[in-house]
Structure formats: C-alpha cells, structure tokens
Design a protein with these regions (language model features):
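Short, charged, solvent-exposed linker or helix-capping segments at domain edges/interfaces
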Residues: 108-113
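Non-catalytic interaction-recognition regions
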Residues: 1-107, 118, 125-589
Length: 589
C-alpha cells in the first residue's frame, strides 16, 4: 500500500502545486484494502479529499477538474504513465480510486517477506528503552483464581509486544505479603491449631485458601476476632520487617505467628512459581509489599504538610483538590496502607532500574485509586507518574454475571481452568503436546478480546477446531508444517517441459495480501499495547490460508516452488504472531 500512497502523493503534488500540497496534514492520503465486492485490491478516497482541499484553499481548478471524479481521472491518467506501476486503476462513484494489482506486485511482496522476514516486519519504536511490565500481582496467603490467569497471560503478551519493538523488558510482580488478608489467614490457621509443618507440601495451599475465607468471615462477624486480627496485623508487619532469621523465645505467641507467617509465605511463592511455569511466564523481579512499605511510608511522611495532610491521626491525600477523592496513606495505627505501598513501589522500581516506562496492568476496579496515588506522587516527583502507564482489564465473572471474590470463596481457581481445558481436549489423549494445545487455547480465548471489558470463559468453545480459537490456529500451523515436511521428502518425476508462467489465482493473491498486512497490524498492536489486534489478524489470516490450501495444489503442481514459498511465509507469520501471544504450534494434532 505504501507504493500506492507514494504514487498518489507524487501525482497530487503535480496537480495541486507546492503551496496546496505542502499544506496537507501528515497521513492525509490514505489507502486501504478494497471491499471484496469491488473486485479491486486496494481503494482510496484521496481524490475526493484532495478536491475538497483545493476548494477550501482557494486554489484555482482547471477547466478539466471541476469535480472529485475529474480529479480522480487526472490522477489515474498521470499514474498510469508509469509503466512500472504494478496496478491498474478504476474510478468508482463520485471519485473513488480502485487499484487492481498485476501478478508482478504480489510476486514482489512474497519475495520481500521470503528474503528477509525479520527486517520487513521490524518496528523498533521501543529500541534501547528500559520498560518495566508489572502484572499478575497475586497476594501470598491467597489462592490464584482465573483473574490472575487472565492478567498473567495479558501481561506476558504485552511484554512480548514491547520486546518485539526493541524494548528491554523487566517483568515485575507486586504482591501483598503483609496486610489484613495475611492476618485473617493466620488467625484462622491458629484457630484450627495448624502449625508451620502443616504448610510444607504444595497441596497445603488449599488450607491457606480456606483459612482466608474463614478469617474474613470472623473479622466481619465477630468483634473479638476483629480485635485479635487487628493486633495480628501489627505484629506481622514487625515479623516481616525483622526477616526470617530473627529468633523468638520458645513457646511464645510471636514465635508461633512468625513460623506460620514464613511457612505460609514460602509456600505461597513456591505455588506462584509452579503456576507461572505452567502458563509460560517468568518474572524477573518480585516486589513483596513488605519490601517497599517502609520506603512508601517515608516518602509520605517527608511530604506531610506540602502534599499529604494529617486527619484524625491518619495521613491522607486530599484528592478533592485535584477533582479526585481523598484516600488514607498511613492509618491511625501508623501502618502504611496499600496507597503508601504503591508510593514505595514506584520509587523502588526507579531505584532498581531507572525505567523509561513502567506499564502497570491491573483490574479496572482500581482506576480511580491509581489516579489518586499517581496524582499524589506527581506533586513532588512528577517524572515518575509521567513515565507510568496504567492499563486496566475487566473482571472474570461466574455464571450469572457475579463477580468473583476470594473473600467469599466463590471463585474459580486458576488451576481448575487449566485442568478443565485439558479435560475438554481429552479426545487428543494425554500426549506431551496436550499442554501446548490447552494453554494455547486458554491464551487465545483471553487475548482475542480487547483489554478493558469483562471476560467470560467457556472451555468447550476455547478448544473448538473450527471456530475462532487457539486450537484452530495451532491446527492451521500443523497443517502448514506437514506440507513443508512432505515437500522435503517427496519424489518427483523429472520435468520434460518448461513450467508455464505462474499466474496467481485469487486464493494466492488473497493470502499474500493478508500476509502483507502483518507489519501494519504489529505497528497498531505495539502502539496501542493491544494483543487482540494480533490475535484477530491471525484468525483472519488462517482462514485465508485454509481457502488457499483447499483450492491450490502445492506438491506436484507446476508452481510447487512458488506455492511452497507462500506456505513457508504463512508459517513464519503465524509462528511469529502466536509467539507474541505466548502460544506454541505443536508438532502433531
């Protein structure tokens, strides 16, 4: 399409003159794939826009250019003077330019991708930039639910988009290893007389999950329990601050709490690591809240009176002054809240990496919360919020559209989703490839939707071999691999006549045209940090490949070499795009 745009620009300058042409905004001349019912390959409304620009600028129109269609006819005539231009032009309606390609054009496109695929899709907008991608952010002492699965998959794909664009990505994970949720869990563990030794095996994470629900219920319904949990919360901050090597007197309350705390914390992080390994995510840096809380509290305290204010024994940020809402950063017990910990996090990230950009991916229920936190920091360290991009996603809901809650215990565990999809693929058998297929199905099911809205996940739909699914794309990739493998071992009779000239059929043209869109899709996906752009493109591309496969014999045809190159290029694009989504193509399906 760039070739058409450049040619229209060249002609427009001749027709309009330098003064009018130079006043045109950037990207004023646009070309896009033509609607299928036109019979053209590309289309442009440039003549109509340029004619309007001529009139509004007061430029004189000639005797032969009195309408947009006249201008379109002039552009057509001047463009077609170039015999090397690989398109014929038809005028439609009031002045649409429809471009119909010659075979030579598609051969050039195919050769371009075949000769240097990586260079032709390159888009290094993040080159030499250090970017922190923070995502997933589960809390120790809680079980991972399907929402964590979603944000882990989305965060990994966004990280890969930035890496494709040349960025040095640090994958970061921020989680609450201190706070009321920990105190509630430990209170319930102690109530059930569970000890540190009872939190040693991977399956013991279930005990933590149940105790969090029980502890939350006690906190909300029992005043005596609430007082004890509040005191536990204060003690846990001290235990976390002292570290795991502090020795407490035997048979004391602090020792029992410390042992439970460190055993539960260790079990939680091991559980997280196992889960992330299963979904193909590896974090470079964990930021437990206990490691940033002090820094956040200090930054807040250092700016009391200038940014933050005292209110009833607590420290607040008066958000109403900035058309936001007021939030507490240090509570009246002197403990830093989530807000202060986020302040500490952004400064700790900066100390560690001096990032060019920090991308934070969370649920959209904390949009307003993050606005307050970042606004408060911008009053005394404006560069850090300016470098921070907050991307939010919707909730994962249970049947009946009820939001999941680990407090209530009515949530879908992340591992249950993984297991359910593997079960749905049972007809494929428990092969080594089953994991690639199942995790690919889940990733695609999440990533094909634009980030921001709510997600409803159906296991059976995600493993469909015919619909818009990851399994369909993987199967298409396996099919392409098999064609190339068969070609490598096929026995061919020696040709006795010269092969006829390769005249592309409509399926070859359509597939090559779709392949040529990939670099543009990547630019959009990187610019918007939008994996769904890649996912939906790959589905459209694979449908084109399916039509090509059905109607274009490859092995043994007169144009086997050329068609194998189409298959090879398709596989390159598919593998590259699926890699951005974190999906692998299995060898067999």
């Amino acid at each position: 399409m760039e070739q058409i745009v450049e040619k229209i620009r060249e002609v427009a300058k001749r027709v309009l003159g330098d003064e009018v042409y130079n006043a045109l905004p950037p990207n004023y001349i646009e070309v896009s794939p033509a609607p299928k019912d036109t019979g053209a390959d590309y289309a442009s409304s440039a003549a109509m826009k340029l004619f309007g620009q001529m009139k509004s600028s007061g430029a004189a129109t000639s005797e032969t250019i009195k309408s947009p269609r006249d201008l379109a006819e002039t552009i057509k005539k001047l463009v077609e003077e170039d015999e090397g231009f690989p398109f014929s032009i038809e005028i439609a309606g009031p002045g649409f330019l429809n471009f119909i390609s010659r075979d030579e054009y598609w051969k050039q496109i195919l050769a371009k991708y075949s000769d240097n695929f990586a260079e032709n899709i390159s888009y290094r907008v993040y080159s030499d930039k250090q970017v922190i991608c923070e995502f997933s952010d589960p809390n120790p002492f809680k079980v991972l639910h399907v929402g964590h699965l979603y944000t882990s998959i989305m965060g990994e794909s966004i990280s890969r988009l930035v890496e494709f664009a040349g960025g040095k990505v640090i994958r970061a994970n921020f989680g609450g290893d201190v706070g009321l949720h920990v105190a509630k869990t430990i209170y319930a563990l102690m109530k059930k007389d569970l000890k540190a030794k009872d939190l040693a095996k991977p399956e013991d994470i279930g005990k933590i999950s149940l105790c969090y629900v029980d502890g939350t219920r006690d906190y909300e319904e029992n005043e005596n329990a609430k007082e004890k949990i509040t005191e536990l919360n204060r003690l846990i901050y001290e235990i976390a601050d002292a570290g795991p090597d502090k020795i407490y007197p035997d048979n004391t309350y602090p020792k029992e709490v410390a042992e439970l705390y460190w055993a539960g914390r260790t079990l939680s992080y091991k559980y997280f690591d196992d889960f992330y390994a299963r979904v193909g995510v590896k974090f470079d840096k964990y930021y437990p809240e206990s490691t940033v809380a002090k820094r956040g509290k200090k930054e807040v305290e250092d700016h009391i009176g200038t940014v933050y204010e005292m209110s009833n024994g607590a420290v607040i940020f008066p958000g109403e002054k900035y058309d936001l809402h007021t939030r507490v950063f240090i509570n009246n017990e002197g403990l830093p809240t989530y807000e202060a910990k986020d302040v500490g996090l952004i400064f700790t990230k900066w100390d560690d990496y001096h990032f060019d950009q920090s991308i934070v991916i969370t649920g959209n229920d904390i949009i307003d919360y993050m606005k307050v936190v970042l606004c408060s920091i911008s009053q005394f360290a404006p560069d850090l919020p300016a470098r921070t991009k907050h991307i939010t996603h919707g909730n994962v809901r249970l049947p009946g559209n009820e939001k999941m809650s680990s407090r209530k215990g009515n949530f879908i565990k992340a591992v249950d989703v993984l297991d359910e999809v593997e079960d749905a693929l049972g007809n494929l058998g428990k092969t080594p490839e089953i994991h690639k297929i199942s995790i690919g199905a889940i990733k695609y099911a999440f990533l094909k939707y634009k980030i921001g809205g709510n997600i409803e996940f159906e296991a059976k739909e995600s493993v469909s071999m015919t619909g818009n699914s990851g399994v369909y794309l993987q199967y298409s990739g396996v099919r392409a691999k098999k064609v190339l493998a068969a070609a490598a071992t096929a026995k061919r009779a020696e040709r006795t006549t010269e092969a006829p000239e390769w005249k592309l059929n409509q399926y070859e043209k359509s597939l090559i045209r779709e392949l040529d869109q990939y670099r543009l899709v990547l630019k959009e996906a990187v610019g918007e940090l939008a994996p769904h752009k890649v996912a939906n493109y790959l589905y459209d591309l694979s449908q084109e490949f399916s039509r090509f496969y059905e109607h274009s014999k490859v092995i043994g045809s007169d144009w086997e070499k050329e068609r194998l190159e189409i298959v090879r290029t398709y596989l390159n694009v598919l593998e590259h795009g699926l890699n951005i989504l974190g999906i692998e193509i299995p060898e067999e399906m």
